[in-house]
Amino acid sequence: MSSIGTGYDLSVTTFSPDGRVFQIEYAAKAVDNSGTAVGIKCKDGIVLGVEKLIQSKMMLPGSNRRIHSVHRHSGMAVAGLAADGRQIVARAKSEATNYESVYGEAVPVKELADRVASYVHLCTLYWWLRPFGCGVILGGYDRDGPQLYMVEPSGISYRYFGAAIGKGKQAAKTEIEKLKLSEMTCREGIIEVAKIIYKVHDEAKDKAFELEMSWICDESKREHQKVPDNLLQEAKAAATAALEEMDAD
């Protein structure tokens, strides 16, 4: 970065001469160094998957979760600094609870995404704060059907058919674009997301990983739940077989 060391990267409130805010770019870099998180919108719901890198062999399986429930009908996948992600999840839960207490119904996914994005953006406006070093994929089911959003460290949010963040995001996006999501069920989507995460994982450079998955669909009664173990094992087996077949070619 051309302006490193010249003082333009010392505060989130300082623009460089070419219009960049380096603190936000550094936060985005923290996300890019994280395990890959993928979300897809299928015809009957949302599937979220995360490549959770295992930092130590002594860690218990299932610890330091990267996928969290925000509300009955919405969930969030986190890439980047896990502690920052927990703070965003806590804020999202608070916003969802507050909306329901005021309006008497579950918060729409778009409203929740906008509120989370505004909170993330707030931390890019004042010199005594730092940007969140994480990005999140938010999936949910409301009166408009299944919806998928991604919130970046800059505080911007977009609605997607399929989204990916983290170390393997470019390769994951390429694979997502090949899928016919409008014709795919969540059961099929679970297998495809597992295949994508296994494919983008670099065994030579990356640590071992744990596949974490959840869904919000008609089969889960439109509630955010972990993918059942039998379906998760089936997806892992299909992903491993696809990877071995690709290596054989």
From Swiss-Prot:
Query: One Pfam annotation, family name?
Result: Proteasome
Q: Which InterPro entries match?
A: Ntn_hydrolases_N, Proteasome_alpha, Proteasome_alpha-type, Proteasome_asu_N, Proteasome_sua/b
Known partners and oligomeric status: The 26S proteasome consists of a 20S proteasome core and two 19S regulatory subunits. The 20S proteasome core is composed of 28 subunits that are arranged in four stacked rings, resulting in a barrel-shaped structure. The two end rings are each formed by seven alpha subunits, and the two central rings are each formed by seven beta subunits. The catalytic chamber with the active sites is on the inside of the barrel.
User: What is the protein name given in its UniProt record?
Assistant: Proteasome subunit alpha type-3
- Taxonomic lineage of the native organism: Eukaryota, Viridiplantae, Streptophyta, Embryophyta, Tracheophyta
**Where does it reside?**
Cytoplasm; Nucleus
Cross-referenced SMART domains = Proteasome_A_N (SM00948)
Superkingdom is: Eukaryota
User: Mostly located where?
Assistant: cytoplasm
The question of whether Signal is a record keyword is answered with no
Query: Which Gene Ontology terms describe the biological processes this protein takes part in?
Result: proteasome-mediated ubiquitin-dependent protein catabolic process
Write out the GO cellular component annotations.
cytoplasm; nucleus; proteasome core complex, alpha-subunit complex
Instruction: State the species of origin.
Output: Spinacia oleracea
Per the record, the similarity remark reads: Belongs to the peptidase T1A family.
Q: Which PROSITE patterns match?
A: PROTEASOME_ALPHA_1 (PS00388), PROTEASOME_ALPHA_2 (PS51475)
Biological function: The proteasome is a multicatalytic proteinase complex which is characterized by its ability to cleave peptides with Arg, Phe, Tyr, Leu, and Glu adjacent to the leaving group at neutral or slightly basic pH. The proteasome has an ATP-dependent proteolytic activity.
Keywords, ordered alphabetically:
Cytoplasm, Nucleus, Proteasome
